[in-house]
């Protein structure tokens, strides 16, 4: 066998397993620059742990996560500072560990580290983590996070739930952000683009007769995906960290930052089947030559690409068909306006900036949390002007966000939920956030200092960052 043939064979065999390496809940996470070519085109990136996607971080319900993030970024053509947001974590009493730059912290600078220390007393399910500084996560800094429930009430529905059953979807760009549109869709870090139809694809292996809990995570910066697996149905049992009553579908649409757990019964003929994630981007749609695809391979099937055809989707997921396994009931009274405070968020776009109630979000030089800790409590005095809203304690809030705005649909993400502190609300299309589509809720500002005592290392972040950036405050 020639060297080139051996290399091709090794690469092909290496693609046969797409299980992610697992770390945590107490760990160190190096943030590094690296040149990678997940779709065959080499480019500079920013990565967690030197891999794309970043390593799977795991823990159990009740764990104390202690993740020391070490900034080893040196590529001056890209951002060399960073922050990490632990997407979906409530961060009760640890608002300072939430991660969005200039909302709850200053960025970590090259050569420094910062310990994110938070507990998950009541949360379980499928989450993820990513940079929350400008557009940095689009350049690679994103990975899955799973909190397992040792007493999962739906464990009887599946046989396998481990690192081999996590599926990540990502848009991929051949140049540093913000150049749109994406060149490729990556599934578990591998994919093809029209210019290289022979790049490796992720292979997810199953054994006939077993039931698998797959955890699907959209780490997208922009597109949403229609996700299907040829010849198989999916029984959804979790959405965004919430257990749902089992609901069977043939396909689903998943937006940026969303997560679903579904059970797949490996009861079809031993063979290879296409996994499809079709983006809503006209230039990259379809499945010609294996783009937007991965492979579901039964043990014992030949090592080759599938020949299955996409079947007609007759039972597509409608989110209104999902119901919580345990329904705590929504707060407030069951009609519009049956709350303590109703807020209408009017979204507009002028061609380059987004506005919420006539204000674009522009990151302040002093984080909102630091402003509050220094005694500025009124939203009218907090920066950025027009983008901070006070929420009183022990109140129910109704948000109204109109549809039909340019660039939609806009998948909005609310950090925190019911805890004192400044919490980001923003569109999770990262390019829209960068263009101002965000606000901050200063919830129970007067109690923030008492409820969220910050560690000494947090106090050092801003002076260190300001010195590195030559900022005078």
UniProtKB/Swiss-Prot annotation:
Self-association and partners: Homodimer.
Main localization, broad class: secreted
PANTHER family xref list: FI03373P-RELATED (PTHR11709:SF394), MULTI-COPPER OXIDASE (PTHR11709)
Binding site for Cu cation 4: 410, 427, 432
InterPro entries on file: Cu-oxidase-like_N, Cu-oxidase_2nd, Cu-oxidase_C, Cu-oxidase_fam, Cu_oxidase_CS, Cu_oxidase_Cu_BS, Cupredoxin
Glycosylation sites: 75, 226, 283, 309, 346, 350, 374, 470
A Pfam family per the record: Cu-oxidase
Organism domain of life: Eukaryota
Range of residues in the leader sequence: 1-21
Biological process terms in GO annotation: lignin catabolic process
Domain (Plastocyanin-like) ranges: 23-148, 160-298, 365-444
Cysteines joined through disulfide linkages: 106-462, 138-221
Gene that specifies this protein: LCC3
Entry-linked PROSITE patterns: MULTICOPPER_OXIDASE1, MULTICOPPER_OXIDASE2
Residues where Cu cation 3 binds: 132, 415, 426
Functional note: Lignin degradation and detoxification of lignin-derived products.
Manner of cofactor binding, per the entry note: Binds 4 Cu cations per monomer.
Enzyme Commission number(s) from the entry: 1.10.3.2
Keyword Repeat: yes
Protein name: Laccase-3
Any one Gene Ontology cellular component term annotated for this protein: extracellular region
Enzyme class: oxidoreductase
Cofactor: Cu cation
């Amino acid at each position: 066998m020639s060297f080139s043939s051996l290399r091709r064979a090794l690469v092909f065999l290496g693609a046969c397993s797409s299980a992610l390496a697992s770390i945590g809940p107490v760990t160190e996470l190096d943030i590094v620059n690296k040149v990678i070519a997940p779709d065959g085109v080499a480019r500079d990136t920013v990565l967690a742990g030197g891999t794309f996607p970043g390593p799977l971080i795991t823990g159990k319900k009740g764990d104390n996560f202690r993740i020391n993030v070490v900034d080893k970024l040196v590529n001056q053509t890209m951002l060399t500072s960073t922050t990490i947001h632990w997407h979906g974590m409530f961060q009760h009493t640890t608002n300072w560990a939430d991660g969005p730059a200039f909302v709850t912290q200053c960025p970590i600078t090259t050569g420094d580290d910062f310990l994110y220390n938070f507990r998950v007393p009541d949360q379980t399910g499928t989450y993820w983590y990513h940079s929350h500084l400008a557009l940095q996560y689009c350049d690679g800094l994103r990975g899955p996070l799973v909190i397992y429930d040792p007493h999962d009430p739906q464990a009887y529905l599946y046989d396998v739930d481990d690192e081999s059953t996590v599926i990540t979807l990502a848009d991929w760009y051949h140049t540093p952000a913000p150049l749109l549109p994406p060149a490729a869709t990556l599934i578990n870090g591998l994919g093809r683009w029209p210019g290289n139809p022979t790049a490796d694809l992720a292979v997810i292996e199953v054994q006939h007769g077993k039931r698998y809990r797959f955890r699907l995570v959209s780490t997208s910066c922009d597109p949403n995906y229609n996700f299907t697996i040829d010849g198989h149905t999916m029984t959804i049992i979790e959405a965004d960290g919430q257990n749902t009553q089992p609901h069977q579908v043939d396909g689903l649409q998943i937006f940026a930052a969303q997560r679903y757990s579904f059970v797949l019964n490996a009861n079809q003929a031993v063979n290879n089947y296409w996994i499809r994630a079709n983006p809503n981007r006209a230039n990259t749609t379809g499945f010609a030559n294996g783009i937007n695809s991965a492979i579901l391979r039964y043990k014992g099937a030949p090592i080759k690409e599938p020949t299955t055809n996409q079947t007609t989707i007759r039972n597509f997921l409608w989110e209104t068909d999902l119901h919580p396994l345990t329904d705590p009931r929504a707060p407030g009274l069951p009609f519009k306006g049956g709350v303590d405070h109703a807020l209408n968020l009017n979204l507009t776009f002028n061609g380059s900036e987004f506005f919420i109630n006539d204000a674009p979000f522009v990151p302040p030089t002093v984080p909102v949390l630091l402003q509050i800790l220094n005694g500025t409590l009124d939203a009218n005095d907090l920066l950025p002007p027009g983008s901070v809203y006070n929420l009183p304690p022990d109140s129910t809030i109704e948000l109204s966000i109109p549809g039909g705005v340019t660039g939609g649909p806009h998948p909005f993400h609310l950090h925190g939920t019911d805890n004192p502190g400044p919490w980001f609300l923003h569109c999770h299309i990262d390019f829209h956030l960068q263009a101002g589509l965000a606000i901050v809720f200063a919830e129970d500002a007067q109690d923030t200092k008492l409820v969220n005592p910050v560690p000494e290392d947090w106090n050092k972040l801003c002076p260190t960052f300001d010195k590195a950036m030559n900022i005078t405050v």
